[in-house]
A protein has these predicted regions:
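A short, acidic/glycine-rich surface segment
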Residues: 32-34, 40-43, 62-68, 101
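N-terminal beta-strand motif that seeds the catalytic metal site of vicinal oxygen chelate
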Residues: 1-17, 75-78
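Vicinal oxygen chelate
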Residues: 1-2, 35, 46, 89-128
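Short, charged/polar surface micro-motifs in flexible loops or helix N-caps
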Residues: 51-54, 62-63, 85
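Exposed loop/turn and edge beta-strand positions of beta-sandwich/beta-sheet ligand-binding modules
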Residues: 5, 41-43, 74, 109
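Core segments of cupin and vicinal oxygen chelate
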Residues: 11-54, 94
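Mid-chain, well-packed structural core segment of small domains
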Residues: 71, 78-86
Length: 128
């Protein structure tokens, strides 16, 4: 099997409007499709970044919380590449988004930082 790329990552949120604001207004993604699925009582948004499908944002009634932070089995975090980490952190600060201190990858010598989405899903910004 030859995999070409990651097509998208699905994220279930507890507060759809809050998460929609976070992924669009804070992270700068664009919603290209948004639908209400009556049979599941669920909203679904397809979020794109630079013309690439990235996040499938779902709402479901009463989803359970993440079992632990962040070491539960399964998806650990989402990572996005940025050109300038300091500039990206300034934007997070300007939008009131708390983040951890900047760290440096011991293997690549690249800088990175972690913060969380509204449901506590860890997100990493990794400098190019």
């Amino acid at each position: 099997m030859k995999l070409n790329k990651i097509h998208h990552v699905a994220v279930i949120c507890s507060d759809y409007e809050k998460s929609k604001h976070f992924y669009t207004d804070v992270l700068g993604m664009k919603i290209v499709s948004e639908n209400y699925r009556e049979g599941r009582d669920s909203l679904k948004a397809d979020c794109w970044l630079d013309d690439n499908y990235v996040i499938e944002l779902f709402s479901f009634p009463n989803p359970p919380a993440r079992p632990s932070y962040p070491e539960a089995a399964g998806l650990r975090h989402l990572a996005f590449e940025v050109d300038d980490l300091s500039e990206a952190i300034d934007e997070l600060d300007g939008k009131g988004i708390a983040h951890e201190p900047i760290r440096t990858d011991e293997y690549t010598d690249k800088r990175f930082v972690f913060f969380s989405d509204p449901d506590g899903l860890p997100i990493e910004l990794y400098e190019k």
